[in-house]
Amino acid sequence: MYLKETIDSFASNANILKLLKKDAQFNHHCIEEMVSKGTELIYNRDREYFYLIEQGYVKYEYDGQLGRRFHFLFGPGSFPFLPIYEDDVPNISKIEMLADVRWWRVEFSFFKKVMRVEDPRNYILLAYMARTRRELYAITIQDRLNSQDRIYFSLLSLIDLGFRQKNNSVELPIFLTYKRLAEFSNTSKGYTSKVLSELRAKKILISSKKPWVITDVEELRRLLGADQLPQLP
């Protein structure tokens, strides 16, 4: 059994870069890049690099073996993908910049070489796999919900990428739009607009200008019935 705080601290952006910079070849294998909002990058199974996000947000998307499309959102401190098993790498995947992004492009072979010495307990991989487990579990739960609840669920899921104003009030990420929320919730834009209008009428959401604000997180959780949803075992 590991302490979450220990794993998360070791796998933080700052510590990963600190460990990589211990190697004198760091500047030859790690490059800091700026990528503009709206840029889309397509990847095949050959993954020579992975990316460590310092600023901005991205959407990582791929099609599963049965044709199901998966998407995941990542912000500062995350890496959209980390190729652990070759067989698990999708044939085609895409990263879309939801905002201007600054990240480190890291050669995976260099990362493996350094971490054999600096992370012998594989804390960084454990943190990545734990996060992936939570995300896939959330997708499973969301798939069981009706259209309205999927929208509620998506809004609540975006809290971690937002800015908490008060204990019960959160600014949502600036990239969020009706179209994006409909996409994340697997609903139509028209139905999404209707549900958001109802939330505004109940004084739960402010979406007339950006950033959108959930003004009553607990009430939104109550509408979803969040406490009754299955929890990650």
Language model region names:
Residues 32-33, 41-43, 47-54, 71-72, ...:
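His/acidic/aromatic-lined binding-pocket segments of jelly-roll/cupin-type domains
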Residues 31, 40, 57-62, 79, ...:
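Short beta-strand segments in beta-sandwich/barrel cores
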Residues 48-61, 65-66, 76-77:
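Glycine- and acidic-residue-biased ligand/ion/polar-headgroup-sensing regions
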Residues 122-184:
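Polybasic "coupling" helices that flank or enter modular domains
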Residues 161-233:
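Phosphate-/nucleic-acid-contacting segments
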Residues 1-40, 78-80, 84-87:
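Cyclic nucleotide-binding regulatory module and flanking cytosolic helices
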Residues 71-137:
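Cyclic-nucleotide recognition modules
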